[in-house]
C-alpha cells in the first residue's frame, strides 16, 4: 500500500487525524528512561505503545537524533512502529532540498536506510531536487508550503505575478509535481486564513499541519478551514504537547491522555 492509503486507513480505523511528533530532547526526558542504554528509543517505544490506537501517523524529526549521534535510535524507533503499530505510517521530518544527485542520496537515506513511509522536503531549489523523492511512488513526499514559524513570511509571503510564493508552491504541487499522487504540503496551524485559502486552492491535497499544541495553533480553525469535503485530508501534528505531557514514571499514560484529548477536540469540529 502507499503512504496515503495507509495513513487514511489508520485515520479511519482510529477515528483520528492526529500525527504525533517523536522529537525527544534528553533534558526533558523522564528520569526513569534517562539511564537506559537507548533512552530515546525507550521513550519513543513507550509513547508509541500508549498512542498507537489514537493516531493516523508518527513524525520523528531527524535532527533530534542526528544532533546527538542517536541515528540508531531513530532507525530502531521506525522499525518498532512498523512492527508494533502495523498500518500506522511514519513521516521522517528532514526538510531536505539539494541538487538532483545529492537528493537521490537523501531519498535513499529516508526510504531505504530508515524505511520511512514519507518524508518532508524543501521546494526552494525546484522540481529536480524533489523528483528523486517523488519517484518512490509508494512513498509520501510532503512539501513545505506555508510554515508555522514566525518569520516564514520573509520569503513565503513575497508576491510574484500577483500571488504569494506559498500559493505558487501549492499550485505547482497540485498541477505539476503530483503525477504519482504521492505529494502533500506542509501548512502551519498558526496561519489559519492562509490554510483556508490553500484548501480552496487545493481541495483534495493532503496537508501536514504543525503548530498546534506548544506553538498555539487554533484547532477549531485548522479543522474547519483545512479539512477536505469528507472531513479528512489533514495530518495534525503535535509533538511537545503530547510526548512531554508528563514528566514522571506515568509519562506514557500522560501522553495517551493528551493524544486522546487532541483527537477528541479535532473530532468535535469535523463534519
Predicted regions and their residues:
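Short amphipathic alpha-helices and their capping/turn segments at secondary-structure boundaries
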Residues: 1-14, 48, 127-136, 219-228
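Active-site beta-loop-alpha junctions enriched in small/polar residues
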Residues: 21-27, 63-65, 95-99, 124, ...
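Conserved anion-binding
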Residues: 98-186, 204
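Conserved, mostly hydrophobic/aromatic
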Residues: 20, 58, 93, 119, ...
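N-terminal active-site wall of soluble small-molecule enzyme domains
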Residues: 62-112, 191-194
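Short, well-ordered coil/turn segments that N-cap beta-strands
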Residues: 14-18, 53-56, 86-88, 117, ...
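Conserved N-terminal beta1-alpha1 strand-loop-helix module at the mouth
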Residues: 1-60, 65-87, 250, 256-271
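A C-terminal functional module that forms or caps the active site or interfaces directly
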Residues: 189-237, 241
Amino acid at each position: 500500500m502507499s503512504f496515503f492509503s495507509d495513513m487514511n486507513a489508520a485515520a479511519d480505523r482510529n477515528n483520528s487525524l492526529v500525527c504525533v511528533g517523536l522529537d525527544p530532547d534528553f533534558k526533558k526526558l523522564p528520569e526513569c528512561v534517562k539511564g537506559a542504554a537507548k533512552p530515546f528509543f525507550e521513550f519513543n517505544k513507550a509513547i508509541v505503545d500508549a498512542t498507537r490506537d489514537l493516531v493516523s501517523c508518527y513524525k520523528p524529526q531527524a535532527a533530534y537524533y542526528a544532533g546527538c549521534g542517536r541515528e540508531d535510535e531513530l532507525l530502531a524507533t521506525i522499525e518498532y512502529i512498523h512492527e508494533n503499530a502495523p498500518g500506522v505510517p511514519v513521516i521522517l521530518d528532514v526538510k531536505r532540498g539539494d541538487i538532483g544527485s545529492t537528493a537521490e542520496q537523501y531519498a535513499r537515506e529516508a526510504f531505504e536506510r530508515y524505511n520511512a513511509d514519507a518524508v518532508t522536503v524543501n521546494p526552494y531549489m525546484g522540481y529536480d531536487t524533489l523528483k528523486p523523492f517523488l519517484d518512490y511512488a509508494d512513498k509520501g513526499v510532503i512539501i513545505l508550503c506555508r510554515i508555522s514559524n514566525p518569520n516564514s513570511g520573509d520569503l513565503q509571503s513575497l508576491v510574484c505575478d500577483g500571488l504569494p510564493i506559498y500559493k505558487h508552491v501549492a499550485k505547482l504541487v497540485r498541477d505539476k509535481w503530483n503525477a504519482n499522487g504521492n505529494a502533500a504540503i506542509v501548512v502551519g496551524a498558526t496561519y489559519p486564513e492562509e490554510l483556508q485559502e490553500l484548501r480552496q486552492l487545493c481541495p483534495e491535497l493532503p496537508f501536514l499541519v504543525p503548530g498546534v499544541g506548544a506553538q498555539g495553533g487554533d484547532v477549531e480553525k485548522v479543522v474547519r478551514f483545512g479539512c477536505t469535503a469528507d472531513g479528512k485530508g489533514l495530518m495534525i501534528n503535535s509533538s511537545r504537547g503530547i510526548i512531554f505531557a508528563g514528566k514522571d514514571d506515568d509519562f506514557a499514560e500522560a501522553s495517551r491522555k493528551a493524544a486522546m484529548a487532541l483527537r477528541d477536540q479535532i473530532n468535535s469540529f469535523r463534519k
